[in-house]
Amino acid sequence: MNILERAALTALHRMDPEKAHSLSLSALRSGLVPLPGPVTSPRLATDVGGLVLPNPVGLAAGYDKNAVALAALMRAGFGFLEVGAATPRPQPGNPQPRLFRLTEDRAAINRFGFNNDGAATICARLAMRPRGAVPVGLNLGANKDSPDRAADFAAVLAACGPHADFATVNVSSPNTERLRDLQGRQALTALLEGVMQVQAGFARPVPVFLKIAPDLSDADLAEIAEVALASGIAGIVATNTTLARDGLRSAHARETGGLSGAPLFERSTRVLARLSELTEGRLPLIGVGGVASAEEAYAKIRAGASAVQLYTAMVYQGIGLAARIARGLDALLLRDGFGSVAEAVGTGRADWLT
């Protein structure tokens, strides 16, 4: 991390977390933030569910919810970006305060509740984005007051799919009441059928991923793996934030909402490894949760991930983190004799299944 990045983070950490979040996006939009540019190599370039990535380090949904800083983020060293979640209609989300830094734990708790500008506005921004080598996907959400949340996911995909490189069905946010109920076999099967019917009507392929919670039993994971394999989706994103609060030290540890960051790493990686085992490598997995270094990204890949995503770690390490992780990952692959990311996927899975 350079001196300028460190100074900017220090200033942002003196502010309310949500205001700091908004200011960071405004700074990116201004064009004044120094950015590392693209990071790739023959080892890092990879294919995940039909997405061709310059490197496997992605930005998780939730940072640029409304797709307002895409031009800058595409130059920040990420191999792919995910914006949203977008819902059919704009909604304000939950009352503030709803974002909390847990500095001692290198973590955050949020209870945003899918606050966003709505699908129409976000779709228009996706359509106007610069085209380049960095795929941009959309996290699909449902309105809080919707009488048919499954239909909401399909509606957002229908509206925005032509302008997105991929889409993620988010049934795992803990901040919309009863949303996680859609992870059950019957509900999930019906939901994915509706989404995949929409996808089938597109003129070009738009891979669809499913994002799951880390707070699932082994039986739940087995059901999800079975449904996912049968549905025709491109892969699974594992995982979203957790409701667990084990071992936290920060003053905000008991705030309600989803916990992200360092404390999620082990839990999410164990879920990832179990999914890799259940799907027998037939379904690409994207590992999310606590990735803050090249070593942690590499651990996710060796546990079964074909790519990784991060967000909370940027709160503590800055916008240049993705590029640093990608370069470090390249060195780790070279050190261990892997010619590609794909060669390393799942090679350490057994370590996470004990």
Swiss-Prot record:
Origin superkingdom: Bacteria
Gene Ontology terms: cellular component: cytoplasm; plasma membrane
Binding positions for substrate per the UniProt entry: 65, 110-114, 170, 175, 240-241
Pathway info: Pyrimidine metabolism; UMP biosynthesis via de novo pathway; orotate from (S)-dihydroorotate (quinone route): step 1/1
Pfam families to which the protein is assigned, alphabetical: DHO_dh (PF01180)
Subcellular location: Cell membrane
PROSITE patterns, A to Z: DHODEHASE_1, DHODEHASE_2
Residues annotated as catalytic: 173 (nucleophile)
Entry note: cofactor: Binds 1 FMN per subunit.
Main location: membrane
UniProt-recorded Gene Ontology molecular function terms: dihydroorotate dehydrogenase (quinone) activity
Cofactor: FMN
Family named by the database record: Belongs to the dihydroorotate dehydrogenase family. Type 2 subfamily.
Known function: Catalyzes the conversion of dihydroorotate to orotate with quinone as electron acceptor.
This protein's name: Dihydroorotate dehydrogenase (quinone)
